[in-house]
């Protein structure tokens, strides 16, 4: 399984790379200011991940382009934290400031589809962010996949293989995180009930 990791200059990227490596993925890591999306699309990736990062989607280099064009090419793409925000913005959503949350655990509820398949309905996840996706103007092309503490914790594109999570599945504060990443790697973003 060949995976592209877009590194938004964040230390959590290394945790994602480590987990996916342990799960058997062949990973190419590209910094957000060093890749050409057209060339990357031609490299035969099976999956793509847009990593967390300290900036906004507008300052995340190729992240917005990858999170839009890879799913449009049929490549299952996961956005984590900043990547989640980039996914929403790439398809017309709004990212807004939020009270900073760093190293906090929250309980979320989810829809049991795609990366959440087979997990308990209520999950504890680790959060590190100061921006969120605004729910009030979430584009119709998305469905909400998880929520917690009054914040969108996950969104999924209704027709393309693209999903975002505000929390950090690669954090030790997210006990089920590695299982979520394993499901993404093995199943892409195909739900157990056949829907996306």
Q: What would you call each of these model-derived segments?
A:
Residues 35-44:
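Short amphipathic alpha-helix with an adjacent loop that forms part of the alpha/beta core around
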Residues 17-26:
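Two-component/phosphorelay signaling modules centered on CheY-like receiver
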Residues 26-32:
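Short hydrophobic/Thr-rich beta-strand motif most characteristic of the beta2 strand and flanking loop
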Residues 43-118, 181-182:
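Cysteine-nucleophile active-site neighborhood
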Residues 159, 164-175:
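Phosphate-binding/catalytic loops
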Residues 114-160:
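Catalytic beta-strand/loop cores that center a nucleophilic Ser/Cys/Thr
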Residues 172-196:
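Acyltransferase
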Residues 1-4:
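Extreme N-terminal starter segment of soluble prokaryotic enzymes
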């Amino acid at each position: 399984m060949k995976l592209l990791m877009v590194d938004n200059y964040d230390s959590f990227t290394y945790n994602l790379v480590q987990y996916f490596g342990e799960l058997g993925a062949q990973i190419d890591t590209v910094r957000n200011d060093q890749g050409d999306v057209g060339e990357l699309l031609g490299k035969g990736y099976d999956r793509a991940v847009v990593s967390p990062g300290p900036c906004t989607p507008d300052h995340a280099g190729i992240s917005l382009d990858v999170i839009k064009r890879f799913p449009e090419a049929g490549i299952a793409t996961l956005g984590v934290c900043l990547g989640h925000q980039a996914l929403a913005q790439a398809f017309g959503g709004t990212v807004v400031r939020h009270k900073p949350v760093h190293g906090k655990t929250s309980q979320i509820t989810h829809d049991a589809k795609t990366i959440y398949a087979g997990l308990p309905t209520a999950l504890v996840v680790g959060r590190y962010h100061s921006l969120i996706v605004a729910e009030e103007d979430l584009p119709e092309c998305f469905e909400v996949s998880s929520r917690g503490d009054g914040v969108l914790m996950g969104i999924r594109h209704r027709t393309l293989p693209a999903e975002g999570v505000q929390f950090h599945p690669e954090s030790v504060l997210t006990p089920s995180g590695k299982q979520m990443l394993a499901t993404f790697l093995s199943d892409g973003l195909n739900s157990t009930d056949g829907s996306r």
